[in-house]
Amino acid sequence: MSKAAAPQIELASADPSIAQEMTRWLSHLGAERRLSPKTLEAYGRDLRQCLDFLCNHWGERVTLKRFAALEATDVRAFMAMRRADDIAGRSLMRALAGLRSFGRFLEREGKGKVGALSAIRAPKVAKSLPKPLPMASAKRLADADERAGEERETWILARDAAVMALLYGSGLRISEALGLKRREVPKPGEGDVLVVTGKGNKTRMVPVLQNVLALVQEYVSMCPYPLPAEGPIFVGARGGPLSPRIIQLAMERLRGALGLPDSATPHALRHSFATHLLSRGGDLRAIQELLGHSSLSTTQIYTGIDSERLLEVYASAHPRR
């Protein structure tokens, strides 16, 4: 059976030929590059905003020929406009990356070469270290008893505890935890590995602790909705897919009760997983595999957090000590 064609994009600021190529470009990124729907949505939004800007900047609808003749000053003006809107540096980097990708796609398709895009330097982004939680705090966030006083149904409290236990216990992204199907999560004593689908639909195997599986099983036994094997294991209050925002709100309530900083987010549990493994002597390459990072340089950011431990190792092991 052939795949359904992607819906045609309509643009008020650009010629239909641009809209057609934009549709083909996003379809290509989804099918060939396996970019996530959220990334495709962001790339599409960035290109729309650029085309809207150029239409206003030039005083005419953007055509393929005009876009191919784009000048560096046009791109810089667009980036300056976005920066004036207080857009973060990382978002500006993504916008420029998307525009360059679209330009390369047009060139490969013989629609023209947008040379100006390669002449623009990517905006500088200050690197900030992840903010892991202390080990005791991370454990409390994954403890169902900490939620006992909340005025919510007990099965929902058990669900939230199970999700956070997976984030900290296996280093999952929140999208990965909520994307797990019931058949993919073993019962306690029947397995100790999860097969997780991460960014770019790449799968990886991660170990899971038996006490974490016990929390998941406790939630499953309390859940009032049927949880078919091929359906998501975590569901919302009405039995539908569980939104990441619900877990974020649960974290906000709990960090207030526990006196934790605003940096205590669901993703901070993943950071804590990596940092605590490293502090206990975990191998950086093994942690890279567990996190699903394609590049070791991404994982190496955690060495900055744990520099104190590395200095201790140096002091105790250096041959000239």
Curated annotation (Swiss-Prot):
Write down the InterPro entries for this protein, in alphabetical order.
CB, DNA_brk_join_enz, Integrase-like_cat_sf, Integrase_catalytic, Integrase_recombinase_N, Integrase_SAM-like_N, Tyrosine_recombinase_XerC/XerD, Tyrosine_recombinase_XerCD
Share an example GO biological-process annotation for this protein: DNA recombination
Quote the SUPFAM superfamilies the UniProt record gives: DNA breaking-rejoining enzymes (SSF56349), lambda integrase-like, N-terminal domain (SSF47823)
**What positions does UniProt annotate as the active site of this protein?**
173, 199, 267, 270, 293, 302
Which superkingdom, per the lineage?
Bacteria
The Tyr recombinase domain covers which part of the protein? 128-315
Its function, per the record, reads: Site-specific tyrosine recombinase, which acts by catalyzing the cutting and rejoining of the recombining DNA molecules. The XerC-XerD complex is essential to convert dimers of the bacterial chromosome into monomers to permit their segregation at cell division. It also contributes to the segregational stability of plasmids.
**Protein name (record):** Tyrosine recombinase XerC
